[in-house]
């Protein structure tokens, strides 16, 4: 682990690696003002939860760091863990197609996950894991400063919005995350299994486009 990360974590009052922690104390905020290189370094060397023991590599995020639209997913899968990039494979291809239909190339948006490491067997992340990782995403959102966020999947939407509402109730309306409009929709992997829901996701994309075009007061 880099000396800079030890300094940052020490300033935060946390150990370099805490394998078990109660969810109530799991959230750790990076110091304000950290830039892209520093946040990327913290993520790359992170040992704040047990996922560091099973990952191949971290998956920081990719795309336009000044994007108007930011896409937030759940966690890396096996292929993402191998390649170090979010949304690859069949789900990634479908996401790319969805974005293209909305007028965006993949490189024009910024794509990141709530979790930067893959949970074993693609299980849902624990409260501890999400609590440790969410501050990284929060800082990424601050740096990108998007005009809208598209949350894809139940876990991404619930973790970002701090709710346990099902995705079927979260989609179709505009939410707020620290002043940024958030639109929730189904995960591309779910749409591959349930193609009949693609129309709803297209409606969600149109909602996001409306926010980008006209703004929205949440």
For the regions a language model picked out, list residue spans one by one.
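A polyanion-binding, active-site-adjacent surface
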Residues: 2-218
């Amino acid at each position: 682990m880099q000396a800079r990360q030890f300094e940052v974590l020490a300033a935060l009052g946390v150990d370099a690696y805490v394998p078990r922690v109660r969810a109530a104390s799991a959230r750790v905020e990076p110091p304000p003002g950290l830039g892209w290189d520093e946040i990327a370094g913290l993520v790359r060397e992170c040992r704040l939860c047990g996922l560091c023991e099973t990952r191949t590599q971290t998956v920081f995020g990719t795309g336009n760091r000044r994007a108007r639209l930011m896409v937030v997913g759940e966690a890396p899968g096996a292929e993402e863990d191998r390649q170090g990039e979010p949304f690859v494979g069949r789900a990634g291809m479908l996401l790319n197609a969805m974005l293209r239909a909305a007028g965006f190339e993949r490189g024009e948006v910024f794509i990141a996950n709530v979790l930067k490491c893959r949970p074993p067997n693609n299980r849902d992340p624990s409260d501890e894991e999400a609590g440790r990782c969410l501050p990284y995403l929060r800082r990424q959102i601050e740096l990108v400063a998007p005009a809208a966020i598209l949350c894809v999947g139940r876990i991404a939407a619930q973790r970002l919005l701090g709710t346990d509402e099902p995705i079927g109730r979260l989609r179709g309306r505009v939410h707020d995350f620290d002043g940024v409009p958030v639109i929730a929709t189904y995960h591309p992997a779910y749409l591959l299994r349930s193609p009949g829901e693609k129309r709803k996701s297209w409606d969600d994309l149109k909602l996001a486009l409306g926010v980008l075009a006209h703004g929205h007061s949440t």
